[in-house]
Amino acid sequence: MRFIMALMLVFASLGVQAKDTPQPEVIFFDVNETLLDLNSMRSSVTEALGGRDDLMSLWFSTMLHHSLVDNTTRRFHTFGEIGVASLLMVAESNEVELSEAEARQAIVTPLRSLPPHPDVKAGLQALKEAGFTLISLTNSSNQGVKTQFENAGLLSYFDARYSVEDIQRYKPDLRTYQWALEKAGVTAEEAMLVAAHGWDIAGAKAAGLQATFIAREGKVLYPLALKPDYKVNTLPELAKILAR
C-alpha cells in the first residue's frame, strides 16, 4: 500500500494524467506571455514612462483590470485601446507626461511584433504532430492576433484563432470559455487551456476545462482558484506528458 501511494505521489508530481481523465481533443492557448514574450516591449513602455522600468508590470495589470471593467459595464474596447488608456493612467498617476499618440506608439506596434518564447515552436509542432487541434484564445483583437502570429511565425501551427472581440467578453468571463467550446464543437471535458496567467487558469477550470499552467518567469497561480491539471515550464514538456 505504501508503495502504491508513493507511486501516486510521484505521478502527481510529474503531472501524469489520471487514467480516468480524458485526453483533450482541443487545446486552447492564451497568447500574450503564454506564447509570446512580452519582455520585448519593456524598452518602449519604459521609455514612455520616463525610464520607470518598475512600472511595466503595473501597466499590464492595469490593462487586465480595465478589461474586466469593460465586461462589467458592457462597454467593449479593443485590447489595444485599453492598453493605451492604461498606459496613460499609469503615467498620470506617477506624474509622467505622456500624450495619447506617444502611448499608442509605445504599445501598438511593439505588441504586434512580440517574439515567441524559445520553447514555443518546438512544443506546438510536437502537439500538432500528436494530432491535437490547436486553437488560440486571446484577449487581443482578430486582426491583432493574426498580425502577431504572422510576425512571430506561428500561423501555420494553429487550426483556428479565436478572439474575445467576437463575443465582447474578456477572459476570464466564463461565457468566453463556453463560447469557445461551442465554436470548436467540443465539451469542456474534451478541451484544455494552456496559459501563463493564474486568472486565465482560474476561469478555464471554473468553466470545466482541463488546464495547464506554463510557469513563465514571474508568473504564479491564484492560490484560491481550482488547481490546474498540469504545471509545466515549457510546451515540449506538456507534449511529452500528453503523449501517453
Regions found by a protein language model. Give the residues of each.
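Asp-based, Mg2+/Mn2+-dependent phosphohydrolase catalytic module
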Residues: 22-24, 121, 125, 141-142, ...
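Positively charged n-region of N-terminal signal peptides that target proteins for export
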Residues: 1-4
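A metal-dependent, Asp-based hydrolase signature
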Residues: 67-105
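Boundary at the C-terminal end of the N-terminal hydrophobic targeting segment
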Residues: 16-18
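An amphipathic alpha-helix signature
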Residues: 42, 56-60, 80, 84-88, ...
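Short, acidic loop-to-helix structural element flanking the phosphoryl-transfer center
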Residues: 80-81, 100-136, 146
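Active-site neighborhood of HAD-like aspartate-dependent phosphohydrolases
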Residues: 20-64
